[in-house]
Amino acid sequence: MVTINDLHYSDPIDEDNIINMRIPLYDLEVDDQFINHNVPDLKAFQVFPNVWVVPERYTFYSTMKNLDAPANPSRSSYYDPTYLQSDAEKEVFLQQMILLFKRINSTQEGQQFLNLLSRSIPVPYESNGDVAMGTTQVIKQMDDKGNVLKHRRAHIIIYGPGPDLMAKGSKALTKSRETGRGCMAEIYFSPMYHKTYSTKLTNKNSLVDKSVQEFVPDPAVTLIHELCHGLHALYGIDLGNVGSWEFNSNPNSLFSSWFSSKEAVNFEEVMTFGGEDVKVIKSEIDKKIPGILNLIKTTVEPIINKITDPHDEMLQCLQSKYPSLKGTLGQFFFDDTQLEKDIRDLWMVMNETMFAENLKALTRARYLVPKVENIVQVDILSPNVYTIDKGFNHLSKGFKGQSVSQSYFRKISALARGAVVRACPNPHFSSQRGLSSCIEILEDDLFIMSSKDSFTDTDFSEPSVGPVSYKAKKGADTILDSTLSNYDFSKEINFTSTVPIITVEDPLETDEDVPVISEDRTVYVDDYTTFHFLEAQKIGKEVVPTQTKVVFTTNMEEALFDSKKVYTVFENTASRINEAGTGIANGMMFYQWLKGIVQDFTEEATQKDTFDKISDVTMIVPYLGNILNIGNDIRKGDFMGAVELGGVTILLEAIPELTLPVLIGLTIIEDELEKEQVSQTVYNVLDKRDEKWEEVYGFVKQQWWWMVHTQFETRILHAYQALNHQVEAIKANMTYQLANYRGNQEDKELLEKAIDDTLQSLYYAVDQAMHNIKRFLIQSSKSYLLNQMLPKTKEQLLAFDQQTLRNVNDFINKNQGVLGESLAKDLKKKVEKRLTSLPVFNLEDLPISEFEDLIHSHEIDIQDSEVLNIGVNNGKIQDLSGENTPLTLGENLHIVNGRDNQAVRLNNQLDSKLEIQSRPNIHFTAFEDFSISIWIRCSMLRNNRNRGQKYTIIQQFNKYGWQLAIQDSVFVWTLHDTFNNQIQLTSGSALTNKNYLLQNFWLHITVTNKRSEKSRLYINGVLQDQKDISVLGNCHPKEPILFSIQDNSDPNYFVRFEQFNVYRKALTDSEVNRLYWKYFEGSYLRDVWGERLTYNRDYYMQLSTLPGRGIKREYRTWSGFDYIILSELGTQKIPTHEVTYPKLYQGQKITIHSDGKNLEPHVKSNKNIRLKIDDFYIGVVNPFKLPEWRPESGAYVVTTYNHAEDLCLYFRTRSSSQSLYYGQLIMNDGRNKSLLNYTLKGSTYWIWSSAWYYENYNTSSKTAGNWYFIPVDEGWKED
């Protein structure tokens, strides 16, 4: 594990970890137009070996000298010339960087990554037999007079930000960054200033809490992105010049007016970001691999084999850097397969997305996110804000710690709004559409599509194929390793403080990246666009919601030119809002109006329809075309009809001009060859042909991803904008009605809360709607690839195959004399067969996981919606959900043995209580669905005064709220709203002689509440009762959730509970069932109450078919044996009910012992046990030895015999039921398995072991072989 040094800016220079450093480019022989030669030597801090932090602004180049804001700043930029100028600020910067490195170092993957950065020295140079570092691979340590003291290793140097505080970047300090040699890298970075993004395109969309609409990335993850660039520079595998996608559009073209002009995205950026984008460039990586491997081998092997000292520092570093090096001193060589795997790991695994997963942080799903929402400032040094183990998310689940709404994020105003496109009516065209004014569109809201130029230069030509054995690329088969298990960092390397150097010709990088600044522009249109429809859904900027009622209209043109009107496609929602007169008369009416809005909007926004016209698209969102102006030119107002006619192509803003690969059939060398060489050449051609198909497939995927799928993603974001515009307009109306409320003014505070609740419900509906929209659009994108793009490409490939076939046949014919006629025919058959077998278009190479994640993300896992989990952990009662909810514990609250581990015991006393403090996460709105579940065990009622009395166990109540109570052993769930309306659910009939075990038995209670439908009560996963609750109002006071027994007259009554959970959703029937059964995933046997069966504990035993009769030991004089029989029937009356039940504590106690091979305290199914009664082990005898028995194969009578061990029997246990908690005991005599049960002979119930029973009844719930194990428990009393 790397040790992160704790350093402070005020610490004196120690010539070790704190030095005076000269910037690496200072001595570059160029004029001041490029390098700022006025930069003094800087104080540098080595936070871990070879990684340095310099708390200074990055101002060393001509374009970065001036810290003032430029005249035309880019969007989302922020300038502050005073930042990082004082020693105090430099100390803060240093501590922030140390904290981020400690966070990265907190996981195994992070430790490996930092080890790589520390040990991966650039490959040294050789001069006159000496091996040393080049001058461009080290930094100069200076004295206070400006003299060079020594040269030091520096792999990564991290500075503060340049002039733009929002800009983060890295720079490889040599032009030969792709040569396999490697070089140091500089990073400029700010841990304090961050851009924010919408949660709609994230790496963990389904896990994000619905309240999080916008998030701030974890700065540790952002730093890792830049460090990955540095790692590539150290290995000399930087892909910065390999390829890129251009997004510059022609501003004079109307077609390109709706597409953004963005900076080019190069392959290196995609690799260091990771995620799904990497899959799309995999074919490019496959092509690059052979050249990179060759460069590394030809660079490293000659150098490392010049080193003669086995203890040499550079030798140790190179061996650590390249675990694929094999051999001994002076004779090192690379294992090609392992080297390829290691390089693929560095490219494909070490990236921002992987580390975001590793650190459990939210990040973008795509590198090319269309829009930065805001910029924020945050102090991560506060432990209440950011921690080493969890970053921002240390106090909450659902990534709420990264929500921009958190108080510790301070929004700051960017200097630029970004470029604007003004869409104005064409002055030379008399439009009948009524276009009369301009609208403004932000550049960042435009569609994104890579230009055709990004793909036109791709070269698919191949050199002539020869007989040299050819190794096909197998990159797709490589298993990537995020833990870098092939690397061994256990051996310490003591880095020397002085590095020998050689002056070499290795020019430093002098190119600078100049950001693309988009300019404002005007375009002239003849018809309405998507952006006009979006504009029509916005409220006018001049509208004051408290003074003006916003009217909803289904006429887009009317809304576009009237700021007080908003266009909508949701007619029911519009009617409900528009028909409400100004000033609602009373609180109940206002509340019902709000509730109706939620119901109408949710129903209309989440609508979807099945779709069978296109095989790849299974559902459609019918209103999508009308809110985004899609398909109106084909079937106005009929989006489904338009898609049926035009296919998914109509969803594109522009049909891209795709580049078809230019393919020429493979050619073959003309040399004279021997028979084996001719055959090998033919096989090489076939392998090369398959590889060419894969290469072209990859090319098609790239074009689809960057020219087609980006348009579908923009549609997704436009849909999200439209739905949010609808919510904002509804919010304005609610504000207007509240300002003009005519009822009791004291109600206003409650109505404000109700409006907040309504907004949360509306945003939840938007989220549900977006799941449908994403599913539809992503399926459509995939359909376009498979049905529009792929067939055209296959035509090219088939023509390529035909030409290749002719070339191969010509080659075979020319060499028939060498091959012989028979072998020539055989080769031709193999060629024809191979070329008729088409390589499959591999969907796994698509970002297919994105499709599956988005399609199924509405199926949120139960655990992901959990917001509270009260249980016992290490002897402490606490919230186990990760939310750390504050608890108040009464003095008479006890921790006892529970169903699985430990439980909480409530006594019927005032100081026996548990309060769960209310917080937003468990305080639901009047419209939010929620569920609760709990394992609970209530002791037997023994006081007659409790008959008919309802007593409460759990509640969140203060004049209104919810309660879980018991009445005559029946569970009662109550919801009571603020208007004094209530509903009650019950768990069934009262106690009878059949369900007497409902008392003192562990039961799983679940209540689900779907506010627009029903509340449902379940016991052990089975539905007991359900009622409509759509008419109820708010049932959630801000009171704590209280566990306390109230209104019970029995002072000895108590309740045990564990696993009290609250979920922010209404669990479905299947989820309730799954939640119950997941508690039985272990193989433990359970006693009659539901707790784990325990070794060395006393139990009564009864058969489930003969309750009230326990086993006992009885001596029979005529045989001289003690036998195990069933006792007489015992009964008991429950004091509080007219119920007589079979006694449980009947017969004699037995003790369970293990077979001596088991160390666990609890009994598992399929384990061997021994049973002891009266200090005698239970055994068996053959029944034919007894006079009144007939011989029967595989049958034994159970007995005991003094203390003799020869009759001791090992029974194998088996769990028979998970709901009634009984088990079976099986004996194996070596020939037959027999089941322990009973048989009635005369008046005696004999216990015996029968093979016939096992064969016929071993799976029946009614068999006489199912045994209850009954421990004495204080919750169950018998006379």
Swiss-Prot record:
It catalyses: Limited hydrolysis of proteins of the neuroexocytosis apparatus, synaptobrevins, SNAP25 or syntaxin. No detected action on small molecule substrates. Disulfide bonds join 424-438. Its cofactor is Zn(2+). The keyword Disulfide bond applies. Transmembrane segments: none annotated. Its EC number is 3.4.24.69. Residues 1081-1279 are annotated as: C-terminus of receptor binding domain (C-RBD). The active site is at 226. GO terms for molecular function: metalloendopeptidase activity; protein transmembrane transporter activity; toxin activity; zinc ion binding. Strongly resembles a botulinum-type toxin, with the appropriate domains and residues to have proteolytic function, although its C-terminus (which binds to a eukaryotic host cell) is different enough from clostrial botulinum toxins that it might bind another cell target. Might be a precursor of a toxin that binds to an unknown eukaryotic cell receptor(s), and be taken up into the host cell via the endocytic pathway. Belongs to the peptidase M27 family. Might be a disulfide-linked heterodimer of a light chain (LC) and heavy chain (HC). This is Botulinum-like toxin eBoNT/J. It comes from Enterococcus sp. (strain 3G1_DIV0629).
